């Protein structure tokens, strides 16, 4: 089998940075996980990303795709942050796959922010076949901010995920772009003004809820988020109700876009969600 991986390098941190990881994400996140920088093939492009997995290789673990926020290099995940975020998730008992998206952090191609870059997420899936401890048949997906949009676009095209976690997710891209002049200019330069409304509509989950799989969705959105309005998640949930899509909406009081003051609550919600839907046996999972 031809490998989809081009490069894999384990992240090694200085003693000072290692202590900072333990302080910020916990001892387990550092001691019980391995996080790697990877380069993989996506539509013939060399794309950068990350891979994380538990140190214990004695069994297989559910797989989770984690979708970053930001556009271009703004929001790209550096190695220190990756060691914390992905190491924590791996320490909970998951194999984690994450993309920087094409055109970013040294990746080839150009970031279309919800266009062909969605393939960079879908092309993470076959990588699980090359990780012995990864269960490539049991997937969850998580997205923050722009990563929420990417998560919805991925789920529109692939219904093989068991659950999803969305944090501060953009579900109405047109509305968000109208309030974010930098992003709107980015899209105008990328798409052109003539097709702008049409293309932003295609990227907006609020317009294709009926095409999403009916899996359990955890939506967390800071009630005081002034970057992506919590109304984006509130209005999406109204659509979820119309189509009987199972979900839980949590609006942490005084929570900002990054939920800095709510990290413990958010981590517990995420951990419990994955535990419930990726690990606990349900009747439909039994053979």
Predicted segments, located by residue:
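Alpha/beta-hydrolase active-site loop
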Residues: 112-132
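Short glycine-enriched nucleophile-adjacent loop
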Residues: 148-159
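Short substrate-entry loop that stabilizes the transition state in hydrolases
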Residues: 57-61, 66-109
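C-terminal catalytic histidine-bearing segment of alpha/beta-hydrolase fold enzymes
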Residues: 68, 234-287
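N-terminal cap/lid segment of alpha/beta-hydrolase-fold proteins
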Residues: 13-58
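Short beta-strand/loop motif that positions the catalytic acidic residue
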Residues: 212-213, 219-221, 225
